[in-house]
Amino acid sequence: MKVQFIGATHEVTGSCTLLEVSGRYYLVDCGMEQGEDIFQNVPLPVPANAIEAVFLTHAHIDHSGMLPKLCKDGFRGQIYATEATCNLCRIMLMDSAHIQESEAQWRTRKAERAGERAVEPVYDTNDAAAALRLLRPCQYNAAVQAAEGIIIRMTDIGHLLGSAAIEMWLTEGKQTRKIVFSGDVGNVNQPLLRNPQPVAETEYLVIESTYGDRLHPKERGDVVGELAACIQRALDRGGNLVIPAFSVGRTQEMLYAIREIKQRGLVTGHDHFPVYVDSPLAVEATGIFLQCDPADFDDETRAILKQGVNPIWFDGLKLAVSSDESKIINTDPQPKVILSASGMCEAGRIRHHLKHNLWRRENIILFVGYQAEGSLGWKLENGAKSVKLFGEDIAVNAEIAMLHGTSGHADKEGLLAWLAGFREKPKMVFVNHGDDSSCKAFCATLKSMGYRADAPYSGTEYDLITGKLTTYTEGVKIDRAAAFKGTQRARQIYEDMVAAAEALLALVKTRRGNTNKDNAKLTGQIVSLIEKWKK
């Protein structure tokens, strides 16, 4: 009976842990690495078709995003997750597959022009559909016999709708051991979500450490009050408030806050001000939030629902799905609030909104989530005077603001508070899902408190029956900075190309009634361009 650490070891993304019980193999999470990769991960030591089941803590792509690849490689077992996680995966994995296909198509066209081989996507929509067919919904707090010798129970961990810590009872022969995987531990007092629920006991614990070396500000901001002030300021100036927000989770939290702002009349002089959600994925996710089991929400949200009030819907909310609906937003002169993805401004429709709004002094760009170093959002937060969008240099004249108190992860104190919920200290605590410094710092904190703890690197294996290491690995650093920058650059170029094509189509639609000579000339130029790049 062994546990082997594969991904999110001394890193924040790519969560994946392998369990071996009675010669059978199981995964906890199967996530995609995102952003810069610091340490090399060992490959799965067994083929995908040898994996009998996957246990999924939540739907975020860094925990679920390689499930379609696992299916592509031969996995045919079941994927256990809460019902809300299953519902979110249905949209998030398909969205991820579309991204993989689009990037592969763009790279293939580039490769073929250079006489090179076509680029295959990491996975496609068929692979994502195959993964979705394997989902097995579980209820919170219900013991499930997932396989011979495997019993699981999922406990709400308060990070995202449907997120769970997973308790596992593993039996091999006459020996039973219990291990708990924390998943991502949520912050307390977040909109919509319950606080992380405690787990009573375990022998072994795998715990995240995203913020294991730091504390959130003691004085957490009044999110609703600060957001209302930003809206008031922007609308009073005749400007827009643009909020880059992650499609799933953060967008819905912002809608919850704006609903309260409108209900309490905290913005004055701008009755029925419009709020646009401009992200197809966010629109789908909002639908899932609206349809989920009310028991998944916190007490405050359930009380609102009992009053017949929709907690994330209000007068003036407008959803933009098509590209035409998105474009109309920036042609409408009425002051407004715009929520769009991606949250770090690296891709998606938010880049169009930044292009149209950054240069205007009356506008506000409000960041409500973490901005990774080097991202466009990070550059704006850190005082960039000009940024390049779609091949143009855009002056940053808009006010840049940050909304505090919105983190979805527990800080060091929050992690320790959740850990204190165990009646007795676990025999061993494994620290993962944090960058190198955070992982090491949180592990050191635990040791100073009397815990037996380790922060394993990828490939480290531990025998749960004997309580001893069977394989010990050191972290192997790899130079992926250049490759990461190249990937980000390629994605930005692709986004710029799509935007240019949309602008060309918009131009064509304005030329009805122009002279035949001019229209024929433009048509010829477009056809020539197409023929040139088809080669």
Label the model's feature ranges.
Residues 100-105, 293-307, 470-495:
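A polyampholytic, Gly/Pro-enriched intrinsically disordered region
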Residues 220-224, 313-325, 344-346, 381-386, ...:
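A general structural motif
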Residues 30-31, 176-182, 187-188, 209-218, ...:
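Acidic/glycine-enriched edge-of-secondary-structure segments
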Residues 150-154, 288-296, 416, 466-476:
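Short, surface-exposed amphipathic charged segments that create phosphate/polyanion-binding patches used
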Residues 1-55, 60, 64, 71-253, ...:
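His/Asp/Glu-rich metal-coordinating catalytic cores
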Residues 228-376, 388, 423, 438-440, ...:
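Hard-cation-handling environments
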Residues 349-352, 407-423:
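A short, acidic, amphipathic alpha-helical segment used as a generic capping/interface helix at domain edges
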Residues 191-206, 293-301, 371-397:
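Short, compositionally biased "basic patch" segments
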